[in-house]
Protein backbone atom coordinates (compact mmCIF):
# COMPACT_ATOMS: atom_id res chain seq x y z
CA UNK A 1 0.00 0.00 0.00
CA UNK A 2 1.44 3.37 -1.07
CA UNK A 3 1.68 6.00 1.64
CA UNK A 4 -0.12 9.23 0.76
CA UNK A 5 2.35 12.09 0.34
CA UNK A 6 2.01 14.86 2.93
CA UNK A 7 0.80 18.19 1.63
CA UNK A 8 -0.01 21.61 3.02
CA UNK A 9 -2.85 22.06 0.51
CA UNK A 10 -6.40 22.10 1.84
CA UNK A 11 -8.54 21.86 -1.31
CA UNK A 12 -11.56 23.48 0.35
CA UNK A 13 -9.44 26.48 1.40
CA UNK A 14 -8.03 26.88 -2.12
CA UNK A 15 -11.54 26.74 -3.57
CA UNK A 16 -12.80 29.30 -1.04
CA UNK A 17 -10.11 31.89 -1.83
CA UNK A 18 -10.14 31.20 -5.58
CA UNK A 19 -13.87 31.91 -5.63
CA UNK A 20 -13.37 35.44 -4.26
CA UNK A 21 -10.00 36.18 -5.91
CA UNK A 22 -11.39 39.02 -8.04
CA UNK A 23 -11.98 40.93 -4.78
CA UNK A 24 -8.32 41.09 -3.69
CA UNK A 25 -7.67 44.68 -4.75
CA UNK A 26 -11.06 46.12 -3.81
CA UNK A 27 -10.47 47.98 -0.51
CA UNK A 28 -14.23 47.95 0.20
CA UNK A 29 -14.75 44.33 -0.87
CA UNK A 30 -14.43 40.95 0.79
CA UNK A 31 -10.78 41.60 1.74
CA UNK A 32 -11.50 44.98 3.35
CA UNK A 33 -10.16 43.79 6.75
CA UNK A 34 -6.78 42.97 5.16
CA UNK A 35 -6.63 46.38 3.48
CA UNK A 36 -7.30 47.99 6.87
CA UNK A 37 -4.75 45.73 8.57
CA UNK A 38 -2.06 46.26 5.93
CA UNK A 39 -0.60 49.60 7.15
CA UNK A 40 0.05 48.18 10.64
CA UNK A 41 1.76 45.02 9.44
CA UNK A 42 3.71 46.88 6.73
CA UNK A 43 5.08 49.37 9.26
CA UNK A 44 6.15 46.53 11.55
CA UNK A 45 7.78 44.55 8.73
CA UNK A 46 9.68 47.59 7.44
CA UNK A 47 10.85 48.58 10.92
CA UNK A 48 12.17 45.11 11.78
CA UNK A 49 13.83 44.43 8.42
CA UNK A 50 15.60 47.79 8.43
CA UNK A 51 16.83 47.20 11.99
CA UNK A 52 18.02 43.66 11.25
CA UNK A 53 19.85 44.43 8.02
CA UNK A 54 21.07 47.92 9.02
CA UNK A 55 19.03 49.74 6.39
CA UNK A 56 17.93 53.37 6.39
CA UNK A 57 14.12 53.33 6.74
CA UNK A 58 13.97 56.76 5.08
CA UNK A 59 15.78 55.56 1.95
CA UNK A 60 13.54 55.16 -1.12
CA UNK A 61 14.48 51.48 -1.55
CA UNK A 62 15.80 50.21 1.80
CA UNK A 63 15.24 46.54 0.88
CA UNK A 64 17.57 46.59 -2.16
CA UNK A 65 19.53 43.33 -2.41
CA UNK A 66 17.19 41.36 -0.14
CA UNK A 67 15.44 38.26 -1.47
CA UNK A 68 11.95 37.97 0.01
CA UNK A 69 9.26 35.29 -0.14
CA UNK A 70 5.59 36.00 0.55
CA UNK A 71 4.09 32.53 1.02
CA UNK A 72 0.32 32.37 0.55
CA UNK A 73 0.53 35.75 -1.15
CA UNK A 74 -3.06 35.88 -2.36
CA UNK A 75 -3.52 38.79 -4.74
CA UNK A 76 -0.22 40.43 -3.78
CA UNK A 77 -1.24 42.93 -1.09
CA UNK A 78 2.14 42.53 0.63
CA UNK A 79 4.26 41.66 -2.41
CA UNK A 80 3.71 44.99 -4.13
CA UNK A 81 4.83 47.26 -1.25
CA UNK A 82 7.82 44.94 -0.63
CA UNK A 83 8.83 45.30 -4.29
CA UNK A 84 8.44 49.08 -4.11
CA UNK A 85 10.81 49.07 -1.13
CA UNK A 86 13.42 47.38 -3.32
CA UNK A 87 13.20 43.69 -2.41
CA UNK A 88 13.48 40.94 -4.99
CA UNK A 89 10.05 39.41 -4.36
CA UNK A 90 8.76 35.90 -4.95
CA UNK A 91 5.04 35.58 -4.28
CA UNK A 92 3.75 32.02 -3.94
CA UNK A 93 0.20 30.76 -3.59
CA UNK A 94 -1.43 27.36 -4.10
CA UNK A 95 -4.35 29.02 -5.91
CA UNK A 96 -3.64 29.60 -9.60
CA UNK A 97 -6.56 32.05 -9.64
CA UNK A 98 -4.95 34.17 -6.92
CA UNK A 99 -1.66 34.15 -8.84
CA UNK A 100 -3.37 35.25 -12.06
CA UNK A 101 -4.98 38.18 -10.23
CA UNK A 102 -1.64 39.10 -8.61
CA UNK A 103 0.23 38.98 -11.94
CA UNK A 104 -2.30 41.22 -13.67
CA UNK A 105 -2.25 43.81 -10.89
CA UNK A 106 1.58 43.85 -10.71
CA UNK A 107 1.77 44.39 -14.48
CA UNK A 108 -0.73 47.25 -14.23
CA UNK A 109 1.37 48.72 -11.41
CA UNK A 110 4.64 48.38 -13.37
CA UNK A 111 6.18 46.06 -10.78
CA UNK A 112 8.49 43.11 -11.45
CA UNK A 113 7.35 40.36 -9.07
CA UNK A 114 8.02 36.65 -9.54
CA UNK A 115 4.62 35.08 -8.87
CA UNK A 116 4.40 31.29 -8.70
CA UNK A 117 1.46 28.91 -8.27
CA UNK A 118 3.18 26.50 -5.91
CA UNK A 119 3.47 25.33 -2.30
CA UNK A 120 5.89 25.91 0.56
CA UNK A 121 7.05 22.31 0.48
CA UNK A 122 7.75 22.45 -3.28
CA UNK A 123 9.83 25.61 -2.87
CA UNK A 124 11.77 24.09 0.03
CA UNK A 125 12.34 20.89 -1.95
CA UNK A 126 13.77 23.00 -4.78
CA UNK A 127 16.31 24.49 -2.35
CA UNK A 128 14.98 28.05 -2.37
CA UNK A 129 16.49 30.36 0.27
CA UNK A 130 15.45 33.85 1.34
CA UNK A 131 16.63 36.72 3.52
CA UNK A 132 13.03 37.28 4.58
CA UNK A 133 9.99 34.99 4.59
CA UNK A 134 6.55 36.52 5.10
CA UNK A 135 4.15 33.92 6.47
CA UNK A 136 1.14 36.16 7.00
CA UNK A 137 -2.42 34.99 7.66
CA UNK A 138 -1.69 31.60 6.05
CA UNK A 139 -0.91 29.06 8.76
CA UNK A 140 -4.57 28.86 9.81
CA UNK A 141 -5.55 27.80 6.27
CA UNK A 142 -3.11 24.94 5.56
CA UNK A 143 -3.79 21.21 5.84
CA UNK A 144 -0.57 20.29 7.67
CA UNK A 145 0.78 22.99 9.99
CA UNK A 146 3.91 21.03 10.96
CA UNK A 147 4.89 20.44 7.33
CA UNK A 148 4.13 24.04 6.41
CA UNK A 149 6.19 25.50 9.25
CA UNK A 150 9.04 23.07 8.58
CA UNK A 151 9.14 24.03 4.89
CA UNK A 152 8.93 27.78 5.47
CA UNK A 153 11.54 27.67 8.25
CA UNK A 154 13.91 25.70 6.03
CA UNK A 155 13.88 28.50 3.45
CA UNK A 156 15.16 31.19 5.86
CA UNK A 157 18.85 31.90 5.23
CA UNK A 158 21.28 32.07 8.17
CA UNK A 159 20.82 35.56 9.57
CA UNK A 160 17.43 35.80 7.90
CA UNK A 161 13.98 36.59 9.28
CA UNK A 162 10.53 35.04 9.22
CA UNK A 163 7.39 36.98 10.09
CA UNK A 164 4.25 35.03 11.01
CA UNK A 165 0.80 36.51 11.53
CA UNK A 166 -2.26 34.48 12.45
CA UNK A 167 -5.21 34.15 14.86
CA UNK A 168 -5.02 32.61 18.31
CA UNK A 169 -7.18 29.61 19.23
CA UNK A 170 -9.13 31.14 22.12
CA UNK A 171 -12.80 31.65 22.90
CA UNK A 172 -12.22 35.40 22.54
CA UNK A 173 -10.87 34.84 19.01
CA UNK A 174 -13.82 32.59 18.19
CA UNK A 175 -16.22 35.29 19.32
CA UNK A 176 -14.51 38.21 17.59
CA UNK A 177 -12.67 36.80 14.54
CA UNK A 178 -15.23 34.18 13.53
CA UNK A 179 -18.70 34.91 14.96
CA UNK A 180 -18.23 38.69 14.98
CA UNK A 181 -16.28 39.23 11.75
CA UNK A 182 -17.93 36.54 9.61
CA UNK A 183 -21.49 36.13 10.91
CA UNK A 184 -22.44 39.42 12.58
CA UNK A 185 -20.48 42.18 10.83
CA UNK A 186 -20.06 40.17 7.59
CA UNK A 187 -16.56 41.57 7.13
CA UNK A 188 -15.40 38.21 5.79
CA UNK A 189 -17.24 35.44 3.94
CA UNK A 190 -18.61 32.80 6.30
CA UNK A 191 -16.25 29.88 6.60
CA UNK A 192 -13.08 31.94 6.06
CA UNK A 193 -11.73 30.63 9.38
CA UNK A 194 -12.34 27.35 11.20
CA UNK A 195 -11.76 27.43 14.95
CA UNK A 196 -10.02 24.05 15.12
CA UNK A 197 -7.41 25.21 12.56
CA UNK A 198 -6.37 28.29 14.54
CA UNK A 199 -2.87 28.14 16.05
CA UNK A 200 -1.82 29.20 19.54
CA UNK A 201 1.41 31.22 20.02
CA UNK A 202 3.10 28.45 22.02
CA UNK A 203 2.37 25.95 19.22
CA UNK A 204 3.81 28.32 16.66
CA UNK A 205 6.88 29.00 18.79
CA UNK A 206 7.50 25.26 19.17
CA UNK A 207 7.28 24.80 15.40
CA UNK A 208 9.72 27.66 14.82
CA UNK A 209 12.20 26.21 17.32
CA UNK A 210 11.90 22.80 15.68
CA UNK A 211 12.77 24.47 12.37
CA UNK A 212 15.94 25.98 13.85
CA UNK A 213 14.59 29.51 14.24
CA UNK A 214 14.85 31.70 17.33
CA UNK A 215 11.89 33.82 18.45
CA UNK A 216 12.85 37.48 18.78
CA UNK A 217 9.50 39.26 19.05
CA UNK A 218 5.80 38.63 19.66
CA UNK A 219 2.95 41.11 19.71
CA UNK A 220 -0.79 41.39 19.39
CA UNK A 221 -2.70 43.42 16.83
CA UNK A 222 -6.04 44.86 17.90
CA UNK A 223 -8.89 46.58 16.09
CA UNK A 224 -10.39 49.88 17.26
CA UNK A 225 -13.97 50.06 15.91
CA UNK A 226 -14.31 53.78 16.69
CA UNK A 227 -11.21 54.67 14.66
CA UNK A 228 -11.77 51.81 12.18
CA UNK A 229 -8.07 51.02 12.42
CA UNK A 230 -5.60 48.41 13.68
CA UNK A 231 -2.70 48.97 16.05
CA UNK A 232 0.01 47.01 17.85
CA UNK A 233 -0.90 45.65 21.26
CA UNK A 234 0.24 43.38 24.09
CA UNK A 235 -3.02 41.44 23.70
CA UNK A 236 -2.33 38.26 21.70
CA UNK A 237 -5.72 36.66 22.44
CA UNK A 238 -7.02 37.22 18.90
CA UNK A 239 -4.69 38.49 16.15
CA UNK A 240 -0.97 38.24 16.77
CA UNK A 241 2.39 38.33 14.99
CA UNK A 242 5.71 36.71 15.78
CA UNK A 243 9.17 37.38 14.40
CA UNK A 244 11.92 34.77 14.33
CA UNK A 245 15.45 34.57 12.94
CA UNK A 246 17.82 31.85 11.88
CA UNK A 247 21.09 32.39 13.76
CA UNK A 248 23.90 33.37 11.40
Swiss-Prot record:
Binding residues annotated for S-adenosyl-L-methionine, in chain numbering: 41, 72, 93, 136
UniProt-listed Enzyme Commission number(s): 2.1.1.222, 2.1.1.64
Enzyme class: transferase
Catalysed reactions listed for this entry: a 3-demethylubiquinol + S-adenosyl-L-methionine = a ubiquinol + S-adenosyl-L-homocysteine + H(+); a 3-(all-trans-polyprenyl)benzene-1,2-diol + S-adenosyl-L-methionine = a 2-methoxy-6-(all-trans-polyprenyl)phenol + S-adenosyl-L-homocysteine + H(+)
GO molecular function annotation: 2-polyprenyl-6-hydroxyphenol methylase activity; 3-demethylubiquinol 3-O-methyltransferase activity; polyprenyldihydroxybenzoate methyltransferase activity
The entry's keywords: Methyltransferase, S-adenosyl-L-methionine, Transferase, Ubiquinone biosynthesis
Keyword RNA-binding tagged: no
GO BP of this protein: methylation
The protein's annotated pathway: Cofactor biosynthesis; ubiquinone biosynthesis
InterPro entries named in the record: SAM-dependent_MTases_sf, UbiG_MeTrfase
Function as written in the Swiss-Prot or TrEMBL entry: O-methyltransferase that catalyzes the 2 O-methylation steps in the ubiquinone biosynthetic pathway.
Entry similarity comment: Belongs to the methyltransferase superfamily. UbiG/COQ3 family.
Protein name (Swiss-Prot/TrEMBL): Ubiquinone biosynthesis O-methyltransferase
Gene from which this protein is expressed: ubiG
Amino acid sequence: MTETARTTIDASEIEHFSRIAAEWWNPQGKFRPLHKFNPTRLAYIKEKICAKFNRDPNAPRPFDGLRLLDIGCGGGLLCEPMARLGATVIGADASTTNIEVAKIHAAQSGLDIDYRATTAEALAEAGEKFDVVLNMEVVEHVADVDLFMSATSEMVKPGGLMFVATINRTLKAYGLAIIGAEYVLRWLPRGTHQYEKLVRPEELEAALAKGGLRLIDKLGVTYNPLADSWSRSRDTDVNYMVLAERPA
